[in-house]
């Protein structure tokens, strides 16, 4: 599916699944169309809607969402290619444990970090 269809299906909560690389792809596609704040709001709204529709509104984690967006948007700066080419150029983004370089488990797993974005306590985000 192309980026436009992906964003439409994400916004309409009609994606059949939403694994890690789909999260990255939505950020990649949306950040080509909007600034950082609008991209964050788009993902926040969509993921919250998806979690609620799946009967698990508590699954949303604001710090994880915003941190991943910031990592993808920073890596995307100046990039002109497809999503697959982007992932090939930035294989570190495939690592689901990448946030561990920026956050301690105590902070990342806290209720406060789940509810509101927390700045990292290990290494700054871009």
For the regions a protein language model found, what residue spans apply to each?
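A charged, amphipathic interaction segment
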Residues: 61-126
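Conserved, aromatic- and glycine-enriched, well-ordered alpha/beta core segments
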Residues: 12-81
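Intrinsically disordered, low-complexity serine/threonine- and proline-rich regulatory segments
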Residues: 1-13
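Sparse, context-dependent recognition of short Cys/His-centered cofactor- or disulfide-binding micro-motifs
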Residues: 3, 53, 88, 92
